UniProtKB/Swiss-Prot annotation:
InterPro entries: PABS (IPR030374), PABS_CS (IPR030373), SAM-dependent_MTases_sf (IPR029063), Spermi_synthase (IPR001045), Spermi_synthase_euk (IPR030668), Spermidine_synt_N (IPR035246), Spermidine_synt_N_sf (IPR037163). The keyword Transferase applies. This is Spermidine synthase 1. It catalyses: S-adenosyl 3-(methylsulfanyl)propylamine + putrescine = S-methyl-5'-thioadenosine + spermidine + H(+). One of its GO terms (cellular component) is cytosol. The active site is at 188 (proton acceptor). It comes from the Eukaryota. Putrescine binds at residues 93, 188-191, 257. It comes from Oryza sativa subsp. japonica (Rice). Belongs to the spermidine/spermine synthase family. One of its GO terms (molecular function) is spermidine synthase activity. Keywords: Polyamine biosynthesis, Spermidine biosynthesis, Transferase. One of its GO terms (biological process) is spermidine biosynthetic process.
Length: 323
């Protein structure tokens, strides 16, 4: 009731426009001091975090960028009003999107990261001693700069000498990559609205497949089974048409992502068989990994295999796209 009264007072005092602007930026105008994540990607619901202090607000050529200190999840990176990273739970996403593909193939040497401007995926890729070359293509330099300033534990990935940073369009970068260049491609994209839209479409997956060696692997962010089954259906259908090796869907928990879960699409090109559900490299006990970046916080071999176990409703829908 108090929130409703506050909203009514705002409207009556002519502050409705300001309230709307606040919602668009992601800061709730109805409950001061709280960030509310509101998006057409999850209509009718919002996730809120208490804001201790706004540390950065800016607008790049592509999106609104904000960093704030929350009371329970540490520093939070927000792009266009949507949470991308929090200090508390980033490990679940970064470790899973990286080690699900890289622990499923033998000695990956060349890895491409599309997106991932916060540096977290780079941090995890650099745990693999077999990797000789890590290319990253991020469209928004502001994301990289902000991460280096406010999230050094993530941006440490940029310091690895094997990393080459390319600021530009990931779709164009892939089209220009020589055929069969990479052992693995990791697509750390935001939701399929705005600049990330192309990263969920069939032509992009075709470019990924061309850039991979035979038996090469890709892992891409693939939304929530609770909110986006219609999107996941399309992704699965496109991937089954493009990738002639393995095609699997995995998921994990990330408390600050919509519905508290996020999915991953894992595919391999025709060639040596890839069994994504059973990792062949045990990174959690790897001395190089622990020495270079410290112990893993989330990923292990058991959770790797478990992540492919789907609820019945999701299993039916994803299985229906098998042909």
């Amino acid at each position: 009731m108090e929130a409703e009264a506050a909203a009514k007072r705002a409207r009556e005092s002519g502050d409705a426009a300001a309230a709307g602007a606040g919602e668009q930026a992601g800061i709730s105008a109805v409950i001061p001091g709280w960030f509310s994540e509101i998006s057409p990607m999850w209509p009718g619901e919002a996730h809120s975090l208490k804001v201790e202090k706004v540390l950065f607000q800016g607008k790049s050529d592509y999106q609104n960028v904000m960093v704030f200190q929350s009371s329970t999840y540490g520093k939070v990176l927000v792009l266009d009003g949507v949470i991308q990273v929090t200090e508390r739970d980033e490990c679940a996403y970064q470790e899973m999107i990286t080690h699900l593909p890289l622990c499923s193939i033998k000695d990956p040497k060349k890895v491409l990261v599309i997106g991932g401007g916060d540096g977290g995926v780079l941090r995890e890729v650099s745990r693999h001693s077999s990797v000789e070359q890590i290319d990253i293509c991020e469209i928004d330099k502001m994301v990289v700069d902000v991460s280096k300033q406010f999230f050094p534990h993530l941006a440490v990935g940029f310091e690895d000498p094997r990393v080459s940073l390319h600021i530009g369009d990931g779709v164009a970068f892939l089209k220009n990559a020589p055929e069969g260049t990479y052992d693995a491609v990791i697509v750390d994209s935001s939701d399929p609205i705005g600049p990330a839209q192309e990263l969920f479409e069939k032509p992009f997956f075709q470019s990924v497949a061309r850039a991979l060696r035979p038996g090469g692997v890709v892992c891409t962010q693939a939304e929530s089974i609770w909110l986006h089954m219609h999107i996941i259906e399309d992704i699965v259908a496109n991937c089954r048409q493009v990738f002639k090796g393995s095609v699997n869907y995995a998921w994990t928990t990330v408390p600050t992502y919509p519905s508290g879960v996020i999915g991953f699409m894992l595919c391999s090109t025709e060639g040596p068989t890839v069994d994504f559900q059973h990792p062949i490299f045990n990174i959690e006990d790897n001395e190089f990994s622990t020495k270079s970046k410290g112990p893993l916080k989330f990923y292990n071999s058991e959770i790797h295999s478990a992540s492919f176990c789907l609820p019945s409703f999701a299993k039916r829908v994803i299985g229906s796209k098998a042909n």
